[in-house]
C-alpha cells in the first residue's frame, strides 16, 4: 500500500469530516528601493476542498502603483465539482476552469492568478551568488547553532536554529524555529497536494528551510532539524550597512467546524474569462 496514502488516511481519521483547518501566515519584507511590503496568506483545507488567499500591502506609492496597487487574490480547488477558481477580491472578479481542461493541458492550469507574477524578493541575490567566483565562495564563513532548549512560538514548542554566512558581499543572518507538532500542517499540505494530483499536476513546495537550501548550494555539511518551520527571520547586510530584511511567521493554525462558504466564491463577484 502507498505510504503517502496511509499517512493521509491517518490524518483524515484524526481530523473529522465536519471540520476544516485554517492557517494564517504573515510575511514582512523591507528592501532598498522597494521599501516595506507585507503579505498575509490565509489557507483553508477540508476534505476535497482547498482555498488560498493572499493580501499584499505595499508601503511606497510608486512601487505600489508599479505593481498595480495593493492586491487581494486567491484560488479555490473544489474536488467534488472538479473545478478550479481564481479570483481578484479587489476587482470582485473570478474565472473558473474544470479539472478536465487542466488534464488536457498536461496538468498545468490555464488560468493564472496574478499573484504568481509578483516576486516578493530574493531573485536578484541568487543571480549574484551564481556570478561569484570559486575563490569568493571559499572565503565565505559559516556558523550554525541549534538551541538545546525549546521556545514557545505561536503556541508551539519550537527549537531555534541560527545560521550566519559571512562573505565578501556581507553578512547573512537567518533565524528559524521548528516544531515537531506537525499533524495540522501535514493535513493542509496533503489536501492541496491530492487535489493538484487529481488533475495531473504537481504541487510546488516552498523550501522547508532557507538556511538549509543555502548551505546545500554552498556544498556545506550541516545538521538538519526535524519538523515544520513556524517562524523565520533573514537579514542581509553589505559593507555599507545597507541591507534586506524579511520576516515570516505563522500567526495561527486551527481546526474549526466546517464552513462551506469558506470554499465558495462571493455572490457579488463577476465571472470573467481570465483575470487581468
Regions found by a protein language model. Give the residues of each.
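Extended soluble regions of mature proteins
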Residues: 19-276
Amino acid at each position: 500500500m502507498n505510504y503517502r496514502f496511509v499517512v493521509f488516511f491517518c490524518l483524515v481519521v484524526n481530523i473529522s469530516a465536519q471540520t476544516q483547518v485554517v492557517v494564517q501566515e504573515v510575511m514582512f519584507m523591507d528592501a532598498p528601493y522597494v521599501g516595506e511590503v507585507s503579505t498575509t496568506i490565509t489557507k483553508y483545507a477540508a476534505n476535497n476542498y482547498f482555498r488560498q488567499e493572499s493580501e499584499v500591502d505595499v508601503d511606497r506609492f510608486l512601487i505600489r502603483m508599479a505593481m498595480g496597487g495593493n492586491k487581494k487574490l486567491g484560488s479555490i480547488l473544489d474536488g467534488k465539482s472538479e473545478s478550479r477558481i481564481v479570483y481578484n477580491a479587489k476587482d470582485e472578479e473570478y474565472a473558473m476552469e474544470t479539472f478536465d481542461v487542466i488534464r488536457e493541458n498536461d496538468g498545468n492550469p490555464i488560468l493564472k492568478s496574478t499573484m504568481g507574477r509578483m516576486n516578493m524578493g530574493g531573485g536578484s541575490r541568487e543571480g549574484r551568488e551564481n556570478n561569484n567566483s570559486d575563490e569568493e565562495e571559499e572565503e565565505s564563513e559559516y556558523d550554525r547553532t541549534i538551541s538545546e532548549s525549546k521556545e514557545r512560538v505561536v503556541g508551539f514548542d519550537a527549537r531555534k536554529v541560527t545560521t550566519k554566512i559571512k562573505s565578501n558581499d556581507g553578512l547573512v543572518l537567518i533565524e528559524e524555529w521548528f516544531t515537531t507538532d506537525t499533524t495540522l500542517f501535514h493535513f493542509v499540505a496533503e489536501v492541496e497536494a491530492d487535489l493538484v494530483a487529481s488533475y495531473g499536476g504537481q504541487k510546488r513546495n516552498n523550501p522547508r528551510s532557507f538556511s538549509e537550501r543555502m548551505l546545500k548550494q554552498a556544498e556545506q555539511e550541516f545538521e538538519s532539524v526535524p519538523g515544520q518551520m513556524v517562524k523565520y527571520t533573514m537579514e542581509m547586510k553589505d559593507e555599507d550597512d545597507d541591507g534586506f530584511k524579511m520576516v515570516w511567521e505563522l500567526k495561527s493554525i486551527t481546526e474549526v467546524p466546517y464552513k462551506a462558504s469558506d470554499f465558495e466564491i462571493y455572490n457579488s463577484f463577476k465571472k470573467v474569462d481570465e483575470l487581468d
